[in-house]
A protein has these predicted regions:
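Conserved flavin/dinucleotide-binding core of flavoenzymes
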Residues: 44-90, 212, 416-417, 467, ...
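Active-site rim elements
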Residues: 155-166, 261-268, 335-344, 450-455, ...
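Conserved beta-strand->loop/alpha-helix structural units within folded catalytic cores of enzymes
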Residues: 100-115, 130-133, 428-435, 465, ...
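Active-site/ligand-binding neighborhood in enzyme catalytic cores
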Residues: 251-394, 404-408
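N-terminal export leaders
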Residues: 15-32
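Mid-domain catalytic core of redox enzymes
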Residues: 388, 392-516, 520-525
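N-terminal glycine-rich phosphate/pyrophosphate-binding loop and immediately adjacent elements
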Residues: 58, 75, 89-267
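N-terminal secretory signal peptides
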Residues: 1-14, 41-44
Length: 642
């Protein structure tokens, strides 16, 4: 009989004490009660918040009640998915409000549409953004911790950015100029007396693309002859306990110098097959190589296995064999590589844009540090004096033209807020949300768009931020990033922090830090739709406590031999569950099949006074493409505004 695992107990001061005013906020609190009441109660507790037994500990600060898909937004989305909103719509209260544009979704897509609206109309027209979460930003939110006198931040979802060139044109560069986002960034200088560990400036490059630049470890299991192999690519994987054949295949994949197709239609050719078929049928690799790359695809942008992922989509990730080679250049320093991370991920970018559109949305002035760290002024977001307003905890349940789309002068929007259904009118709508919701709430959606949306598939990710009181155990190991092949999760990383004034985070093994874990839920061997469904079921079924225990056990297994003690060293764990984190483009998604129009192009057409603008339409859900898609949708639909 197997020995029963001893449950590791965390210090009660880590999270169990963190109730709101001594009372646990129940599932759906943000929908059932006044948002103002929730915010006021949160602000009373400096230690942090446990929102409910499923959402769990949220950290401290404004984002503490909005870590990932919290229970309230999950439940509201499932009501929409399951078709329970018809009666709610019939009971809607007409508010008498009328807008020139209503944007559904307060993430990067929505804010990209709002930016375009404001650039054209300034203070002369009215726009309302409806956001279903308790805090704006979509996946561009942050987790905050207070540990031993230090304020620490980690990305909830959207992370990793590269600033445009100062003299460049285009939407993204214009946003930087208008909002005051810097074009140049500095990072904490490494003190070799404190640590010699090389850490990335963001959370991804240490686990594949720039693995040779940074100190990365492969955990082979605590019972392995060599549990950790440090920097395995330094000697072409020689120390890994894998077969010589497999290691030779991986080295050939990493080298990636051969062209496998010379036609002018390379992208279409790649989109005609899965990445697995490219690796195995075209490049001649074994299935072991595919299995090696599967979790890399899953955490970076795909969410699914290579067996259902378009080869062209893999090219967008610069994966081997796609002729978009990512070459490690040792002559560059890591700053020159140009992949950075704000303390709270791309929340730093979003906060600059919202401050530009609604100047009082973040308290204080316009300095870089103030915008990054000052409290959100929630009362300023939905102020009728603003040309652009944002209404939080407002879940859209129905969007439809007033009459036939081709003749309509208005669109009616019904939404749920504070336990009531409200109805407003608008001249135009931008659906800045994913198709898994959009197709269910736009009730007069044409069959052509509905059919196209049936070819959009999405997959989940779990991002876990673990605040530790020190990272001596990583320093002793000599790593900043890690990868493992069995157990909970697959990757973790710490970053060398960005310099952000007085709140610059330390880079010292003796001081606190945030370790970010990426947990994929890919299920190779199943159809693309099924992989997403299975992944979401796994993501959603466990309580916070169950995940907490798995994380602690995994960290203990990997790090206990190097001085790690969970009860002593962990200061907080925040889960960020994203049920539809990624579009998972199957072969044909980008360029169509058998001469048919690609599904994303069908949706981009919109209809009547409603346009769709979400990063999924690019087949690659990044913050820049979200801004671009939202901008495009707004420009298209603004032709209906007089």
């Amino acid at each position: 009989m197997a020995k029963k695992k001893k449950k590791i107990k965390l210090n009660a001061n880590i999270s169990r004490r963190d109730f709101i005013g001594g009372t646990l906020v129940g599932v759906g609190a943000a929908l059932l009660y006044s948002y103002k009441d929730v915010i006021n109660t949160v602000s009373k507790d400096p230690h942090g918040v446990i929102n409910d037994s499923w959402t769990g500990y949220g950290g401290v600060g404004d984002y503490a009640i909005s870590n990932g898909n919290v229970a309230s937004t999950r439940d509201a989305a499932h009501l929409i998915r399951n078709g329970f909103t018809n009666k709610m719509r019939a009971d809607a209260e007409e508010t008498g409000e009328e807008y020139d544009m209503v944007i559904i979704g307060g993430g990067f897509s929505g804010i990209g549409a709002a930016y375009e609206f404001y650039k054209k109309y300034g203070n002369t027209k009215k726009c309302l953004i409806l956001e279903n979460h308790p805090v704006f930003g979509g996946e561009a939110k942050q987790n905050e911790f207070e540990v031993d006198g230090y304020k620490l931040y980690g990305p909830q979802g959207s992370n990793d950015f590269g600033p445009p060139l100062k003299d460049s044109g285009g939407l993204i560069a214009n946003i930087y100029r208008d909002t005051g986002l810097p074009f140049d960034y500095d990072f904490v200088k490494q003190d070799p007396k404190k640590t010699k560990v090389r850490a990335p400036l963001e959370n991804y490059y240490g686990v594949f693309w720039e693995e040779e630049r940074y100190d990365t470890g492969y955990f082979m299991g605590k019972d392995s002859k060599t549990p950790w192999v440090i920097n395995p690519r330094a000697d072409k994987l020689a120390r890994l306990p894998w077969s010589d054949k497999f290691k030779a295949e991986l080295n050939r994949a990493f080298d990636d110098k051969k062209d496998y197709y010379t036609g002018a239609d390379l992208d279409q050719w790649l989109d005609s097959m899965s990445y697995k078929d490219l690796l195995e049928k075209v490049m001649g690799f074994s299935s072991e190589v595919t299995e090696y790359f599967d979790p890399i695809l899953a955490i970076s942008m795909g969410g699914v296995g290579a067996d259902v992922y378009s080869g062209y989509a893999a090219k967008l990730l610069e994966m081997p064999g796609t002729q978009a080679r990512y070459a490690y250049d040792k002559s560059k320093n890591d700053h020159d590589v140009g992949a950075y991370s704000f303390p709270g991920g791309n929340a730093g970018i979003f906060r600059h844009i919202i401050k530009y559109l609604i100047p009082k949305s973040i308290k204080g002035g316009k300095s870089f540090e103030e915008i990054l760290f000052n409290p959100i002024n929630f009362s300023a977001l939905d102020n009728t004096e603003n040309p652009i307003c944002m209404r939080l905890n407002a879940t859209a349940i129905d969007v439809s033209h007033e009459g036939l789309a081709k003749n309509a002068d208005y669109v009616n929007v019904c939404y749920h807020i504070d336990g009531k259904i409200k109805k407003i009118k608008t001249k135009t709508v931008v659906m800045g949300i994913g198709g898994w919701v959009a197709q269910n709430i736009v009730s007069d959606i044409p069959d052509s768009i509905k059919t196209a949306y049936s070819q959009f598939h999405h997959s989940p990710i779990l991002v876990v931020n673990v605040a530790v009181r020190n990272w001596r155990f990583l320093d002793k190991l000599g790593i900043s990033s890690g990868r493992w092949f069995k157990g909970f999760g697959r990757f973790f990383s710490i970053r060398r922090p960005m310099i952000t004034g007085e709140l610059t985070q330390p880079f010292d093994p003796e001081k606190p830090a945030v370790i970010t874990f990426y947990v994929p839920f890919n299920n190779p061997g199943y159809p693309v739709k099924v992989q997403g469904v299975l992944g979401r079921a796994e993501l959603l079924r466990k309580s916070y406590a169950q995940y907490e225990q798995e994380i602690v056990e995994q960290m203990t297994e990997m790090f206990a031999e190097y001085g790690f003690n969970a009860e002593r060293d962990i200061a907080g764990i925040v889960l960020n569950r994203w049920g539809h984190a990624y579009i998972s483009p199957q072969p044909g998604f980008h360029f169509g099949i058998n001469g048919e129009e690609a599904p994303k192009e069908v949706v981009r057409k919109g209809f009547g006074r409603i346009q769709f603008g979400h990063s999924e339409l690019s087949g690659y859900m990044s913050h820049t493409l979200a801004l671009i898609e939202g901008s495009r949708a707004a420009i298209d639909v603004m032709k209906h505004i007089n």
